[in-house]
Amino acid sequence: MIKMLEGYYIIENPGVVPAERRFRMKDLKAWGYDLHLGTIEGERAYFISKTGERHEGETYIFKGKEYHVSRTQKEIPENARLLARIIIERGNPYLEVWLEEEDVKFPLTKEDPRIILKRIWEKEKLNQLLKHVRAVGLTTDFYKDNVFTQGIPLPYEEYPPKVRRVLREVKDIHRDLTGFGRFVFQYFGEVDKMHNYRLYWTLPTLHLFDIDIANEVDKVLGMLD
């Protein structure tokens, strides 16, 4: 849904925020983890450790349990799925990650998503996301204020081609990548060859753990700089 309301250009896809999502090995790597096959207390299991921290053949104790690394996976096993979801407990968000192998579920981690997102964005140099994030829960809010000279926001018909291209990119992200989102935009023209604008963008947090989607969102946030 697209509408213009009192100087605000709004792109809204009011779909359902997904309960869980499938991820790839490249995403897990971007989060800063290795995936291992081995044993926990002698029972076959998949588990994770920080990148490069554990090695094949190593046995160690973590939180009172004995872990043995038989193999460090290069890919997600063909008969398994890497899944994650955002949950809210006592007002705080958590990212739960697990591996499903047929009917068996192997819990991998439960962490504050803000910590992992910050780690990803710093590692991948996604500076727009780092700078403009405002809130993280089931959804994540970004706010960017590039208003140098306050005035009356322009109607869509007066937007220059570069601004319209940004709006098309936002529509594509909502339609093709996230299925949900709300983008609110005000444009005040150019000042000294710099675009004068303000935006608010809400996206499902879970999708931002997909490194390709995170890169696309970061790119769009920086297109008018």
UniProtKB/Swiss-Prot annotation:
It comes from the Archaea. InterPro entries: UPF0128. Belongs to the UPF0128 family. This is UPF0128 protein PH1314. It comes from Pyrococcus horikoshii (strain ATCC 700860 / DSM 12428 / JCM 9974 / NBRC 100139 / OT-3).
